[in-house]
Amino acid sequence: MSNKDNDLDDDFSLFREAVQGIKKLPQDTIVQQPNRNTKQKEIKRISREASDSEFYFSDEFVPLLSEEGPTRYARDDVSTYEVKRLRRGVYVPDVFLDMHGMTQQEAKRELGAMIAYCVKNEVHCACVQHGIGKHILKQKTPLWLAQHPDVLAFHQAPLEFGGDGALLVLLSIPEK
């Protein structure tokens, strides 16, 4: 036998002698119960997301939007300077929503979910790409955005963010 094998045997025998007579502690046999609140939290989260995505955008309400020039809107309490900054691309969107190929109902649901996501994650600027196509979403999207209480302003996006087929949206983030 080599010297290494003798050292290993000595180590094992020393360990056995050191732990001889030790009993398992009673608390080691207690199984941790799973946190039951996770199911309740999951249910609340799902219902909250469903209500966020079901934010009602009326097709009958038509806000007063400028018909001249590019599509733009600003609430009364928002400076026109902010709209100019949107137009120039000073605000860089952190979130992009591509609505190409969506129905109006899908687009409403996704738009509501995107706005809820932006408010939750404190995203101030988002880009909504509605496309041009048959002009259905291009006409409806500004009307829906103008109805949402968290939308401060929007403007037709600069070319690098989609041009005629997209809107840059400025959102109000409530202070915590």
From Swiss-Prot:
InterPro entries recorded: Smr_dom, Smr_dom_sf, SmrB-like
Pfam families the record matches: Smr
Domain (Smr) ranges: 97-172
Enzyme kind, highest EC tier: hydrolase
The EC number(s) this enzyme carries: 3.1.-.-
Ranges that cross the membrane: none
GO molecular function: RNA endonuclease activity; rRNA binding
Gene3D superfamilies registered for this protein in UniProt: 3.30.1370.110
GO biological process: rescue of stalled ribosome
Alphabetized HAMAP family for the sequence: SmrB
Assembly description: Associates with collided ribosomes, but not with correctly translating polysomes.
Family, similarity comment: Belongs to the SmrB family.
PANTHER family named among the record's database cross-references: DNA ENDONUCLEASE SMRA-RELATED (PTHR35562), UPF0115 PROTEIN YFCN (PTHR35562:SF1)
Name the UniProt record assigns to this protein: Ribosome rescue factor SmrB
Organism this protein belongs to: Vibrio vulnificus (strain YJ016)
Gene name in the database record: smrB
